[in-house]
Amino acid sequence: SKIIIIDTYYLLLGSISKTPEQKVIQTWHAAGALKKFGLEDKSINLEHKQLIKNYLSVYHFTDYYLVSSDIMKDVFIKSLDAKPNQILPFGLPRLDQYKDKHEYPNKSKKLALYVPTYRDYTNEIHTIDKQKFEKMCPEYELVTKLHPSITSHDSDPRDIQDLVEMAEIIITDYSSLSIEAALLNKTIIFYSYDEAKYDEMRGLNQYYYEMTKENKAYDLETLYKLVNLNKINHKIKPMWHQYTNFDATQKLVDFINKGA
């Protein structure tokens, strides 16, 4: 294949070779990044030269990176050793689906969607009690969508994109889903009850702290107040979506047809 399109970094790419004619395009699997990864990952020992060489062989397999903001350009440069001339400010094809918003039947209660980040360093599952939440926030119905690997707790079976479109309020923590929801002008509340621990274990970048100066709760009482207030944080969307025009797929196709 002359063109290889990927949406994350695959370790196996470091062990194979490509021809000079082949081009690899990174479309990325998320609307942005709030967690540190790649060369900025807290678990990586930068003094381990062979390990870093192995990682770089994976990262350097990519020729182009699609971004929807200058922030993600900066993230790819720092995290994956991308070069400025490899950045394509086309927006992300995965976000084109939101060009035509779907209409959903009005319900008696507005939907509050809770989407917690998967924590791979603990078996503890922190959920929000639905009955208590709906008592404290009587205008809302709480729906919880957990990571697919978590099967010990109830999780709404509907598609996450459908739920995001249906919801009035998105409650999350360190997930890039907040960036995706901001594109739809949703109210986003960060329920970051274990922020210090998560930062210690996984690493949160500066952009997380910048965009969570508003609408952040460390406890349930504050969360209830923010839900009832229902105030949109208008800073998130311009941070991450300066190149999002819902035409990224067409731009990518045109780029490939011109010879990539």
Residues of each region from the PLM?
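A short, gly/pro- and small-residue-rich
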Residues: G14-A33, K130-F133, N185-K197
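Catalytic binding pocket for nucleotide-activated donors in carbohydrate/polymer assembly enzymes
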Residues: S176-H241
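Conserved catalytic-core segment of nucleotide-activated headgroup transferases in glycan assembly
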Residues: K78-S79, I87-H153, A217, Q250
